[in-house]
Swiss-Prot record:
Palmitoleoylation is required for efficient binding to frizzled receptors. Palmitoleoylation is necessary for proper trafficking to cell surface. Depalmitoleoylated by NOTUM, leading to inhibit Wnt signaling pathway. This is Protein Wnt-1. Signal peptide: none annotated. It is found in: Secreted, Extracellular space, Extracellular matrix; Secreted. It comes from Plestiodon skiltonianus. Disulfide bonds join C92-C107. Keywords: Developmental protein, Disulfide bond, Extracellular matrix, Glycoprotein, Lipoprotein, Secreted, Wnt signaling pathway. GO terms for biological process: canonical Wnt signaling pathway; cell fate commitment; neuron differentiation.
Length: 126
């Protein structure tokens, strides 16, 4: 008869790229916090805790901010304690601005360039 008696609604997730970009933006703006003490509630004698920025000049985090308690280990240097191998001695791409680029991978230590000439058989036919 042309009339609609049933409606179906559903929620759809954003694209993976959209979620990734959102999380990366939050990660880049994350701030280190400490566990602060707001005082006590006299009625229940329960201590109320909250997160305070490590740097008092920063604003307190909102419920939507990404925060962290501990600094990340230094992945540039070897550490048996954290199990990080460091980046010394690794090959890097001097023309890449990405994670494999020498500027990021060498952690500001500088790097040596090496030019190689490679001759290979290409099995070309003319």
């Amino acid at each position: 008869s042309g009339s609609c008696t049933v409606k179906t609604c559903w929620m759809r997730l954003p694209t993976f790229r959209t979620v990734g970009d959102f999380l990366k933006d939050r990660f880049d703006g994350a701030s280190r916090v400490i566990y602060g003490n707001k005082g006590s509630n006299r009625a229940s004698r329960v201590e109320l805790h909250h997160l305070e920025p490590e740097n008092p000049a920063h604003k307190p985090p909102s419920p939507h901010d990404l925060v962290y308690f501990e600094k990340s280990p230094n992945f540039c240097t070897y550490s048996g304690k954290t199990g990080t191998a460091g980046t010394a001695g690794r090959s890097c791409n001097s023309s890449s601005p990405a994670l494999d680029g020498c500027e990021l991978l060498c952690c500001g230590r500088g790097y040596r360039t090496r030019t190689q000439r490679v001759t290979e058989r290409c099995n070309c036919t003319f």
